[in-house]
Structure formats: structure tokens, C-alpha cells
């Protein structure tokens, strides 16, 4: 579960997020939609601590992310960016397996994850 409690973030004199509150339950897929400059990217960067909030608390599974190691936190969070973030010289399956391999999962577990992800988007037969 990801939770934002009274989160505010400003850049110089512009407040981008003001008193933001929301909860994303485990297993929930979320899409942030809005015009340029409304805070979508800022929100995502706050979740993985590429940015720090000016105030408020962001927690994952009840733990304040400020208390977590940034690198370890990022290893367990994934999101899809607007621009293409794939390796063009790799297959879809190879792209999917990048993170599990970085986490040092064995080949069997990597293959299982790849198949689960392909099935999720109805591409398991490709």
C-alpha cells in the first residue's frame, strides 16, 4: 500500500503539490493523468525518493519511506514512464527480465515473472 498524507512539494516559488492525500491499495494499478505541469512526474519522483517532500509523509506498507534506504526502496518500485524506456536491442521478454536479473533471481523465477507479465497484457503467445 502506498499512502500520501498531507504531502506538499514546491519548486522555488511554485507549489506543485499542496496537501496531497491518497492511498493506493496493494495490487492496484494506478494511472496519473493530467496536463503538463500538474505534478504527475513530481508525485512519481516522490514515491521513489528522487525528490523529497517539503512536508507530509509518504509511506509504503505503513513504513515512512524517509526511513528506508533509497537504493533498496527503488529496487521494489516500478512504474512506466511517458517516454520509451525499453532497450531497443532486446526482445520484450528480455526487457521484462532486466529487473528480476538485477535482483539476482534465478533463471526459473525470471522466466516465470516474464510469463506472468506477458499474460497480464495478453501477450503470452508472442
Predicted regions and their residues:
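Conserved ABC transporter NBD signature motif
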Residues: 56-64, 73, 113
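Helix-to-loop junction immediately C-terminal to a conserved catalytic motif
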Residues: 48
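ABC ATPase nucleotide-binding domain signature
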Residues: 81-85, 90
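Short coil-to-helix segment of the ABC ATPase nucleotide-binding domain corresponding to the Q-loop/switch region
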Residues: 90-97
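The feature captures the beta-strand-to-loop junction immediately N-terminal to the Walker
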Residues: 33-35
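ABC ATPase NBD coupling module
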Residues: 64-78, 102-107
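Conserved ABC ATPase "signature" region
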Residues: 97, 101, 108-126
Amino acid at each position: 500500500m502506498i499512502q500520501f498524507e498531507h504531502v506538499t512539494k514546491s519548486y522555488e516559488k511554485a507549489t506543485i503539490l499542496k496537501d496531497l492525500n491518497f492511498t493506493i491499495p496493494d495490487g492496484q494499478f494506478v494511472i496519473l493523468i493530467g496536463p503538463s505541469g500538474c505534478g504527475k512526474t513530481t508525485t512519481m519522483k516522490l514515491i521513489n525518493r528522487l525528490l523529497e517532500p517539503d512536508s507530509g509523509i509518504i509511506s509504503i506498507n505503513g513504513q515512512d519511506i524517509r526511513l528506508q534506504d533509497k537504493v533498496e526502496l527503488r529496487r521494489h518500485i516500478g512504474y512506466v514512464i511517458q517516454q520509451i524506456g525499453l532497450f531497443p536491442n532486446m526482445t520484450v521478454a528480455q526487457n521484462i527480465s532486466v529487473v528480476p536479473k538485477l535482483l539476482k533471481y534465478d533463471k526459473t523465477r525470471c522466466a516465470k515473472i516474464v510469463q506472468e507479465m506477458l499474460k497480464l497484457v495478453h501477450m503470452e503467445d508472442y
